[in-house]
């Protein structure tokens, strides 16, 4: 079980990312666009640099939905590998079967 503070901090980061996502996308488009002038590009880079660090999506950590475990996360289930194994053995994951070949 992860510390509650780490889970809350990650949730706060998700909210910050969502709040700044649209403006970040606009600024990045200006920076990437060959049609933007060097002044526009510099202004966009400056504004992007002055946004909070946590506004970047790469700072959000994928965590287990049940206990917040940060490692071994499987996106398909939103759970850690440990939790997937436990739930699969208990038959609580629909469509998941133990491999046999």
From Swiss-Prot:
User: Which Cys residues form disulphide pairs?
Assistant: none
Q: Which organism is it from?
A: Mycolicibacterium paratuberculosis (strain ATCC BAA-968 / K-10) (Mycobacterium paratuberculosis)
**Which keywords describe this protein according to UniProt?**
Ribonucleoprotein, Ribosomal protein, RNA-binding, rRNA-binding
- Describe, as the record does, how this protein assembles with itself and its partners: Part of the 30S ribosomal subunit. Contacts proteins S3 and S10.
The UniProt entry's GO biological process terms, in alphabetical order, are: translation
Record GO cellular component, one term: small ribosomal subunit
Segments of skewed composition (Polar residues)? 34-45
Describe the task this protein carries out. Binds 16S rRNA, required for the assembly of 30S particles and may also be responsible for determining the conformation of the 16S rRNA at the A site.
Family indicated by similarity: Belongs to the universal ribosomal protein uS14 family.
Any Pfam family hit: Ribosomal_S14
Give the protein's recorded name: Small ribosomal subunit protein uS14A
Segments carrying the region annotation (Disordered) are 29-60
Alphabetized HAMAP family for the sequence: Ribosomal_uS14_1
Q: Does the keyword rRNA-binding apply?
A: yes
**Keyword Metal-binding tagged:** no
MF terms in GO:
rRNA binding; structural constituent of ribosome
């Amino acid at each position: 079980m992860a510390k509650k503070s780490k889970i809350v901090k990650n949730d706060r980061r998700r909210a910050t990312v969502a709040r700044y996502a649209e403006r970040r996308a606009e600024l990045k488009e200006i920076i990437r666009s060959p049609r933007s002038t060097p002044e526009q590009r510099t202004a966009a880079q400056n504004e992007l640099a002055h946004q909070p660090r946590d506004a970047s999506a790469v700072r959000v950590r994928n965590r287990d939905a049940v206990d917040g475990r940060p490692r071994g996360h499987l996106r398909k289930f939103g759970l850690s590998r440990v939790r997937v194994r436990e739930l699969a053995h208990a038959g609580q994951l629909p469509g998941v079967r133990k491999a046999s070949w």
